[in-house]
């Protein structure tokens, strides 16, 4: 991390001597620091505590000012563990917010919240840095072009297409496949994407962060031999980090992405896994700062904190940031304040369903709950729009009939309804797809399906052309031709058994 020029600079040394405080209280990750009268630091300024603990181990803790308490005291939140700190230790006000390295030097590297490399590959060039707190682009700078961002995932491209330069949310409870879906999107988009990507791991499992790093090295997205040719920068603040780090690591990743957009004028992909942990960390910090909790125990500033982050993730006339964010849904309740606040900022929502995951349909994307502002005839075209609407109507009718089927059975339905149910079950299975990143689990090679192929496949199912084929032929296949080939194989297998 580089906040200011080196401390050997005499001007900086004088200012540091002037702006020296003392720790007056420590409660977990929160420090109260007393400063001389008239030398109070600003909100969001970085404070650094250096010294040695009782065992002689070196201490270097960076904090961020959150409150001015009066009586020349400030309250700050630590970005790393506070073990070894004690009252009376010197604290230096750095005079600026946290600043992190940006630009080409960040590619192929893993950083923590302070912008320090944590991959044991040596130091990073810190000549170009940027503060993590800044205002969103002015309204007049924003870009309003509308175009589809193809992912190669059938259910997403057909029913809830993503916007290039937009914000996308992947909503789901624990264990329904958010991280697998985000890794597949990285695989499909980041590899084919000409620009750069930034991945922010916010409060998730360290193992998943390690898996992602290894996978990116294998696929060539990170080039170990020549890091400058890498296409991604990784910023991690995992589950074991203090709440201050988890609350700010998203801003560190966003700051790196903003530099590529504004200075290099590139199209950037920003992946955040998981935005709920950002809210959760904010809630922890809010309680530590003594604020009165709001609904369900969340911080009273929830909407403001979310808005401050999300408004910076946008596309300008210089370049774009396309953001894909995983959102954990506590107890599968989409009305919980954290996911509900996130909904308002998104162009497309991909909702993952536990019911579909239980059926073994992966990706477990709920075709009726997932939405997109892009699914309009003037944007996607009449053919795409009509096909998507017919698929949704068929699945909605099947959903309505499920209670009748459960009580009376299929035989009691009309001929038309039985046909609808048969097609809906084929559609449901055809919405599943083998993923590249899940090959070890499914045993099937991953498939990328173009948008035109996706539309053709669903149109053929809706037209009744494949009414005679068994529904299992449509499960975990790529395009419709693979489904017909699978049906032929199944028929041959059944004949051989006889």
Curated annotation (Swiss-Prot):
Cross-referenced CDD domains: ATP-synt_F1_beta_C, ATP-synt_F1_beta_N, F1-ATPase_beta_CD
InterPro entries reported in the protein's UniProt record: AAA+_ATPase (IPR003593), ATP-synt_VA_C (IPR055190), ATP_synth_F1_bsu (IPR005722), ATPase_a/bsu_AS (IPR020003), ATPase_alpha/beta_chains (IPR050053), ATPase_F1/V1/A1_a/bsu_N (IPR004100), ATPase_F1/V1/A1_a/bsu_N_sf (IPR036121), ATPase_F1/V1/A1_a/bsu_nucl-bd (IPR000194)
Keywords noted in UniProt: ATP synthesis, ATP-binding, CF(1), Chloroplast, Hydrogen ion transport, Ion transport, Membrane, Nucleotide-binding, Phosphoprotein, Plastid, Thylakoid, Translocase, Transport
GO molecular function: ATP binding; ATP hydrolysis activity; proton-transporting ATP synthase activity, rotational mechanism
Any single Pfam family the record assigns to this protein: ATP-synt_VA_C
UniProt binding sites for ATP: 172-179
Modified residues (Phosphothreonine): 6
Top EC class for this record: translocase
Disulfide bonds: none
Highest taxon listed in the record's lineage: Eukaryota
Reaction catalysis annotation: ATP + H2O + 4 H(+)(in) = ADP + phosphate + 5 H(+)(out)
Places the protein is found: Plastid, Chloroplast thylakoid membrane
Enzyme Commission code(s) on record: 7.1.2.2
Residue numbers of Phosphoserine PTMs: 13
Role: Produces ATP from ADP in the presence of a proton gradient across the membrane. The catalytic sites are hosted primarily by the beta subunits.
Protein name, UniProt field: ATP synthase subunit beta, chloroplastic
Organism of provenance: Olimarabidopsis pumila
Gene that specifies this protein: atpB
């Amino acid at each position: 991390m580089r906040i200011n020029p080196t401390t050997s600079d005499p001007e900086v040394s004088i200012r540091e001597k002037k702006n020296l405080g003392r720790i007056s209280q420590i409660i977990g990750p929160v420090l109260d620091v007393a400063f001389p009268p008239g030398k109070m630091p600003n909100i969001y300024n970085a404070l650094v505590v250096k010294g040695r603990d009782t065992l002689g181990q070196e201490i270097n803790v960076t904090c961020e000012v959150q409150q001015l308490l009066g009586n020349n005291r400030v309250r700050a939140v630590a970005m790393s563990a506070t073990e070894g700190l004690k009252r009376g230790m010197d604290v230096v006000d750095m005079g600026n917010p946290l600043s992190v390295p940006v630009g080409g030097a960040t590619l192929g590297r893993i950083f923590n919240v302070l912008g320090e490399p944590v991959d044991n590959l040596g130091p990073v060039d810190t000549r170009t840095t940027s503060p993590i707190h800044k205002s969103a682009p002015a309204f007049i700078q924003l870009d309003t072009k509308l175009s589809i961002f193809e992912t190669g995932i059938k259910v997403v491209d057909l029913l809830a297409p993503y916007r290039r330069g937009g914000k996308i949310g992947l909503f789901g409870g624990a264990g329904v496949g958010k991280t697998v879906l985000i890794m597949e999107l990285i695989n499909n988009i980041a590899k084919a994407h000409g620009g750069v990507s930034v991945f922010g791991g916010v409060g998730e499992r360290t193992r998943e962060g390690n898996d992602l790093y290894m996978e990116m090295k294998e696929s060539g997205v990170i080039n170990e031999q020549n890091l400058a040719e890498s296409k991604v920068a990784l910023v991690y603040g995992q589950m074991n980090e203090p709440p201050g780090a988890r609350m700010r690591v998203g801003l560190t990743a966003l700051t790196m992405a903003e530099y590529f957009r504004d200075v290099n004028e590139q199209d950037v992909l920003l992946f955040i896994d998981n935005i709920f942990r950002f809210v959760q960390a904010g809630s922890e910090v809010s309680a530590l700062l003594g604020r009165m909790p709001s609904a369900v125990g969340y911080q009273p500033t929830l909407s403001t904190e979310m808005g401050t982050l999300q408004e910076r993730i946008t596309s300008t006339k210089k370049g774009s940031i396309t953001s894909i964010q995983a959102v954990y849904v506590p107890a599968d309740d989409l009305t919980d304040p954290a996911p509900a606040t996130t909904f308002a900022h998104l162009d497309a929502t991909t909702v993952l369903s536990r019911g579909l995951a239980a059926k073994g349909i992966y990706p477990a994307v709920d075709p009726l709950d997932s939405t997109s502002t892009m699914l309009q005839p003037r944007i996607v075209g009449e053919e795409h729009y009509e096909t998507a609407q017919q698929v949704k109507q068929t699945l909605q009718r099947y959903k309505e009939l499920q209670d009748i089927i459960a009580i009376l059975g299929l035989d009691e339905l009309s001929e038309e309804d039985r046909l609808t149910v048969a097609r809906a079950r084929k559609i449901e299975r055809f919405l599943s797809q083998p993923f590249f990143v899940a090959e070890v689990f499914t045993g099937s090679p991953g498939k990328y399906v173009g948008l035109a192929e996706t539309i053709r496949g669903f149109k053929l199912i809706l037209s009744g052309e494949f009414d005679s084929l068994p529904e299992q032929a449509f499960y975990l296949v790529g395009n419709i031709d693979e489904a017909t080939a699978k049906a032929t194989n199944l028929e041959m297998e059944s004949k051989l058994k006889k």
